[in-house]
């Protein structure tokens, strides 16, 4: 138990106690007190005000790797150039084809993490709020796929409430992104009535409106045209009944909604949607697995049959997004999917035609490789996105996801599902001796992180209250050290199957802590 000072209120003590229980529960998932401690900590922290908004564009990156430094400088400058305040919608950033003066559901969802690192979190919230506010029964519980700077549906996509363009994964994608933004920002606005209504309608009424055979999956029927497309691969709108990216996004939304309801102490709803998520994962890893070809099917076609890859050379719906959303089963099936994705990356890099399937699909690759510990492929995919010769490099999603991949992938920074707890997990390759990311906004804190290879990490709590730092390293090590002393460490497998050694370190405001692995 931590000592109580004169400045420490009873509420602070309760929060610290709950935080300790939660962190212990995270390291020992079997603890029966895990759910209780997490709910208690969320309730105690829900009313805490944030200590000011993040400063836009404050983030800085330094490294021994010149390629990464130059790529970061370009991506930061390019991304901030898309941050705008014109129009009537308030602060926003372009997240669509340049020149459309608009932002699209899929793009914002994928760009939101990079935007957070850039200090643009309040803009993301404003944009997400517009999507949430415009969900309606008249549109079969869709919202506006693309919104202009004047808070109107983009005319290229929308005629009226009965004739508009819509990709069915989008509702789920936005819900998942809102949950992740809530973790990053701890902004209680993401739990206001407008957002909660959107979340609830998405996982209930939206599913019922588009699930025509009542099997729990949404379908695109032949007469739908551009309404209710069952995949993000829009070239296949008339060929796919259910895309694997659709079921993957639905799974992610159910997981996000489960966490949101658990945080609100709505445990019955949390249990219901956790069960629904588990059912989708079981269904996908059973019926959607093609044992003969050792890969997942990409879609159910309009003919009612499973298909591996309906579009030669792309196949984005086949494997990328199920991996991205964590739908694939840990072990051989996930490894098979990653192997296919690595082959596609190499084909992409060697193709005289440039990016096969577009930069949109390519922009997910660094996320995925780093997520599953394939740092070598992650580095190749990330630096390819930075390449000045990349076709359509000016597409907004490219620069934003480069920033996000540097932060969450290479640097391994992420907020954990309980407040004031941050994780780092370095994934540097031999090209990068050291790397540092400064002025990163996370919740009520601003932090800096530096990795020396994958053996030493320092974290500075630049501003904000004391925090718990989960310092994790790839591999299994004999011990971890801090301040010249061995510290308690846990060796385990991450949820994605990568071996790790980790420890929890408390970092006060203005303090820098260093953790390193034992040599030898």
Could you describe each region identified by the protein language model?
Residues 82-98, 136-159, 208-236, 285-307, ...:
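Glycine- and aromatic-rich loop/turn segments at beta-sheet edges
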Residues 19, 39-103, 126, 283, ...:
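Low-complexity, Ser/Thr/Pro/Gly-enriched N-terminal "stalk/linker" regions
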Residues 55-74, 131-144, 181-244, 272-279, ...:
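Active-site acid/base region of carbohydrate-active enzymes
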Residues 101-137, 193-204, 244-263, 275, ...:
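Active-site core of glycosidic bond-cleaving carbohydrate-active enzymes
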Residues 56, 373-520:
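Non-catalytic C-terminal accessory modules of carbohydrate-active enzymes
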Residues 74-85, 121, 130-137, 174, ...:
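Glycine-rich, acidic and aromatic/proline-enriched surface loops and short helix-turn segments
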Residues 1-9, 16-23, 34-36:
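N-terminal secretory signal peptides
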Residues 90, 95-101, 146-173, 188, ...:
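The feature captures the catalytic groove of carbohydrate-active enzymes
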């Amino acid at each position: 138990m931590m000592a109580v000072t004169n400045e420490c209120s009873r509420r602070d003590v309760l929060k610290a106690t709950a935080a300790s229980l939660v962190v212990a529960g995270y390291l020992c998932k079997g603890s029966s007190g895990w759910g209780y401690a997490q709910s208690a900590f969320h309730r105690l922290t829900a009313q805490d005000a944030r200590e000011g908004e993040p400063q836009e564009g404050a983030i800085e990156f330094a490294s021994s790797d010149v390629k990464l430094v130059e790529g970061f400088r370009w991506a930061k400058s390019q991304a901030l150039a898309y941050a705008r305040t014109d129009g009537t919608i308030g602060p926003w950033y372009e997240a669509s084809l340049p020149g459309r003066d608009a932002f699209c559901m899929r793009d914002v969802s994928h760009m939101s993490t990079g935007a957070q690192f850039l200090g643009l979190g309040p803009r993301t919230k404003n944009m997400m709020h517009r999507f949430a506010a415009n969900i309606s029964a008249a549109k079969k519980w869709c919202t506006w796929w693309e919104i202009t700077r004047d808070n109107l549906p983009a005319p290229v996509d929308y005629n009226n409430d009965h004739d508009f363009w819509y990709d069915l994964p989008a509702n789920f994608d936005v819900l998942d992104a809102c949950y992740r933004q809530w973790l990053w920002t701890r902004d209680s606005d993401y739990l206001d009535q407008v957002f909660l209504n959107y979340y609830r309608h998405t996982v209930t009424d939206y599913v019922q409106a588009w699930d025509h055979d009542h099997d729990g999956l949404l379908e695109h029927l032949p007469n739908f045209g551009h309404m209710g497309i069952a995949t993000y691969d829009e070239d296949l709108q008339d060929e796919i009944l259910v895309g694997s990216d659709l079921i993957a996004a639905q799974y992610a939304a159910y997981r996000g909604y489960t966490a949101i309801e658990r945080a609100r102490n709505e445990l019955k709803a949390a249990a219901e949607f956790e069960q629904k998520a588990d059912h989708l994962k079981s269904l996908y890893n059973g019926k959607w697995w093609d044992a003969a070809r050792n890969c997942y099917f990409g879609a159910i076609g309009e003919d009612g049959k499973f298909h591996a890859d309906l579009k030669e050379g792309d196949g984005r719906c086949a494997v990328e997004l199920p991996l991205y959303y964590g739908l694939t089963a840990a072990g051989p099936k996930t490894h098979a999917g990653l192997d296919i994705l690595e082959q596609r990356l190499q084909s992409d890099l060697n193709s005289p035609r440039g990016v096969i399937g577009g930069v949109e699909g390519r922009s997910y690759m660094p996320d995925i490789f780093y997520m599953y510990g394939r740092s070598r492929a992650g580095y190749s995919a990330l630096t390819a996105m930075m390449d000045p010769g990349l076709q359509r490099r000016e597409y907004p999603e490219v620069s934003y996801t480069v920033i996000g991949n540097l932060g969450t992938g290479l640097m391994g920074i992420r907020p954990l599902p309980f407040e004031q707890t941050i994780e780092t997990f370095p994934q540097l390759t031999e090209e990068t001796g050291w790397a540092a990311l400064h002025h990163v906004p996370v919740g009520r804190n601003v932090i800096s992180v530096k990795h020396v290879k994958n053996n030493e990490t320092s974290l500075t709590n630049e501003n904000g209250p004391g925090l718990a730092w989960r310092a994790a390293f790839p591999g299994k090590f004999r011990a971890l050290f801090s301040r010249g002393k061995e510290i308690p460490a846990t060796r385990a497998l991450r949820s994605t199957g990568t071996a790790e050694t980790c420890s929890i370190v408390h970092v006060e405001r203005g303090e820098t802590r260093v953790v390193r692995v034992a040599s030898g």
